Amino acid sequence: MSISARNQLKGKVVGLKKGVVTAEVVLEIAGGNKITSIISLDSVEELGVKEGAELTAVVKSTDVMILA
């Protein structure tokens, strides 16, 4: 599949917390850094997200939030 987003981060799922409607996915990327995303449970099932899976996060620069 080809996409236009330039911010693609490959990593491994190191955390997965399922809620009622959404799930929190923690991806460990290069350098041991971690990024967290909230996605729907439907997406978790459709994408086959599970701990240890190798995934690519696609990040739109306009959708980044920084927490301090």
Swiss-Prot record:
This is Molybdenum-pterin-binding protein 2. It comes from the Bacteria. Coiled coil: none annotated. The keyword Glycoprotein does not apply. The lineage of its organism: Bacteria, Bacillati, Bacillota, Clostridia, Eubacteriales. InterPro entries: Mo/tungstate-bd_C_term_dom, Mop_domain, Transp-assoc_OB_typ1. Gene3D superfamilies: 2.40.50.100. Binds one mole of molybdenum per mole of protein and contains a pterin. Keywords: Molybdenum. Disulfide bonds: none annotated. Pfam families: TOBE. PROSITE patterns: MOP (PS51866). One of its GO terms (biological process) is molybdate ion transport. Residues 2-68 form the Mop domain.
